[in-house]
Amino acid sequence: MALRLATRRFAPIAFRRGMATTIEHTKEPISATAEALSASRPPIKETKTSTVKEPQMDADAKTKTFHIYRWNPDQPTDKPRMQSYTLDLNKTGPMMLDALIRIKNEVDPTLTFRRSCREGICGSCAMNIDGVNTLACLCRIPTDTAKETRIYPLPHTYVVKDLVPDMTQFYKQYKSIKPYLQRDTAPPDGKENRQSVADRKKLDGLYECILCACCSTSCPSYWWNSEEYLGPAVLLQSYRWINDSRDEKTAQRKDALNNSMSLYRCHTILNCSRTCPKGLNPALAIAEIKKSMAFTG
């Protein structure tokens, strides 16, 4: 437990300003506990699986360079760095996730990132690629080999390791809105809560959110107030339940947002709507919540 707490506290924040700025390291020194933990660990011997080795290139190889953010919590005194990898695009799939998987499988097994469905459904592989928050499985590799690609973890998140962000605060906020159907009365037929076609249509553009956090971590207001401001993703989810005709706790849901921080830190910067890999519009959902609260309380 002590190791986990030390790692989370001193994991660097990937970005301080903007979505593609130079990394700044924290000014705060490493604690004595973290140093002791690091010193007490035996050194890891280099093996074939831990040695970075570029694959052999063919004569007609279409090479592209990827610069990837690296940070290892097992070496807390080492600063984050960018590590470069060169791949032959002729032997690599079309998506950024294909490149990352090939690097991990064939070049550097120590590279760490999240991934699961590879179809833009789970949201696991959210990261910042060439200055844009997106899903690696949906982001195509630019075919222009002269331009090098830079890959970072999601901006302004604590880093667990390499491209893995700490989503603890994000999911804590999601839990706070009670993202489930709340009713005091049972359905008339005792089977299910029915909904008209028109009411169901009101949920389009809301239920598709996969909680990848691309929008929230692109929002400057969320960067500055992430402890109190819920952020675009959670507010879109909140509107999804406020707008659900089957839910009977609409008033309570609005009351929970009726303070100066949870909702009203949105300043319509619209980064969230621009970056959403699913094409949703969190800014519109936030505006609709504000409008409904202004007219109905």
From Swiss-Prot:
Gene Ontology process terms (BP): respiratory electron transport chain; tricarboxylic acid cycle
Coiled-coil ranges per UniProt: none
UniProt-annotated binding residues for [4Fe-4S] cluster: C209, C212, C215, C276
Names of the cofactor(s): [2Fe-2S] cluster; [3Fe-4S] cluster; [4Fe-4S] cluster
Domain 4Fe-4S ferredoxin-type: 199-229
Chain residues that bind [2Fe-2S] cluster: C117, C122, C125, C137
Recorded family membership: Belongs to the succinate dehydrogenase/fumarate reductase iron-sulfur protein family.
Task of the protein: Iron-sulfur protein (IP) subunit of succinate dehydrogenase (SDH) that is involved in complex II of the mitochondrial electron transport chain and is responsible for transferring electrons from succinate to ubiquinone (coenzyme Q).
The protein, known as: Succinate dehydrogenase [ubiquinone] iron-sulfur subunit, mitochondrial
Species for this entry: Zymoseptoria tritici (Speckled leaf blotch fungus)
